[in-house]
Amino acid sequence: VVHGGPGALGTVAAIARVLSKDSGVIEPLQTSDSIPELLNELDEVITACCDRPITLIGHSWGAWLVFMYAAKYPQWVKKIILVGSGPFEAKYVSEIACNRIKHLSDAEGAEFDELLKRLNSDKEIEKGRLLERLGALVNKSDNYCAFEIDTEKEDCLPVEGDKYSAIWKEAAALRESGELLGFADRIICPVVAIHGEYDPHPVDGVKLSLRNKFKDFIMYTLGKCGHSPWKEKHAYQEF
């Protein structure tokens, strides 16, 4: 189970904990600061812990990471499950901000834009603190009716703003160039996508971009659900 962010270590622990009741689960923490290094790091964990192809679940940014991993190391992947993935094509990006603004006050929306600008600046030195504040706003804009998980505070490690900035620049460039979606041509396993209808990341940016790329693709859209289905009051059981 691969966390999002980038830099949001421990945020999918609740998923891993529930799944571990029925099967073995790995929750790798991303410690590198470039996409090639993250892919190598993930491969090292998988090859050290597994002796057969596995199912990879990625949330948010983590969905992209498992998508790229499945393309680069197809021999290790039985299936990928993309939860709350960002859109795979640049043409959908503008919808994210528009959808988030609808869920925030005017002041919060302005603050959100300013935080993103500062996080993407090479001159900013307090990126960890800024990312924490951004996370608080995202918690409001991206969730429908989320409940607090008892272990969340101890599960989650401090956010890493520098890693977010470095990795996200690479990831956004891959999407802008079309290379991100191009990874689909090398993925041979079944692909499942799970998306909340209230998630600001447009469902069409996943569904329409991927449905003709794979022979075995299934899309589930959850009602009354935001970006993190496992902690949504009305959707977690279906998830």
Predicted regions located by residue number:
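Flexible "cap/lid" loop of the alpha/beta hydrolase fold
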Residues: 80-121
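Alpha/beta-hydrolase
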Residues: 113-182, 189
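Active-site loop/oxyanion-hole signature of alpha/beta-hydrolase fold enzymes
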Residues: 26-61, 72
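Conserved HGGG/HGGXW glycine-rich cap/lid loop of the alpha/beta-hydrolase fold
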Residues: 1-35
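Conserved alpha/beta-hydrolase "acid-adjacent" motif
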Residues: 200-206
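Catalytic histidine-centered segment of alpha/beta-hydrolase-like enzymes
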Residues: 222-237
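Conserved hydrolase catalytic core segment
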Residues: 52-97
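Short beta-strand/loop motif that positions the catalytic acidic residue
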Residues: 187, 193-195
